[in-house]
Amino acid sequence: MLSRLQELRKEEETLLRLKAALHDQLNRLKVEELALQSMISSRREGEMLPSQPAPEPSHDMLVHVDNEASINQTALELSTRSHVQEEEEEEEEEEEDS
């Protein structure tokens, strides 16, 4: 009974870490989406006003959009099985040391 409770607590911790990682990634994607929407709307405004020359975007106006390489730098471990197994092995080692 106690070991099952410990397993559930470890699983909960793993799921909470996974939730946080996914939440961070979701926030990054939302920021990127807003940046892309801003770029699209500014281009549409430029197309609607062809009589005026398009202003050169200043450095402050440029929106940094993550490229694929920087997005992929964040590795998400969606498989909790390997993490749980590692924790179980660590727990067994601790029990053996006791």
From Swiss-Prot:
Signal peptide annotation: none
Highest taxon in the source lineage: Eukaryota
Subcellular location: Nucleus
UniProt feature, compositional bias: Acidic residues: 86-98
A GO-annotated cellular component: nucleolus
Keyword annotations: Nucleus, Transcription, Transcription regulation
GO molecular-function term, one example from the UniProt record: RNA polymerase III general transcription initiation factor activity
GO biological process: snRNA transcription by RNA polymerase II; snRNA transcription by RNA polymerase III; transcription initiation at RNA polymerase III promoter
Disordered, as annotated region: 75-98
Main function: Part of the SNAPc complex required for the transcription of both RNA polymerase II and III small-nuclear RNA genes. Binds to the proximal sequence element (PSE), a non-TATA-box basal promoter element common to these 2 types of genes. Recruits TBP and BRF2 to the U6 snRNA TATA box.
The protein's assembly and partners: Part of the SNAPc complex composed of 5 subunits: SNAPC1, SNAPC2, SNAPC3, SNAPC4 and SNAPC5. SNAPC5 interacts with SNAPC4.
Descriptive protein name: snRNA-activating protein complex subunit 5
Organism: Bos taurus
Gene responsible for this protein: SNAPC5
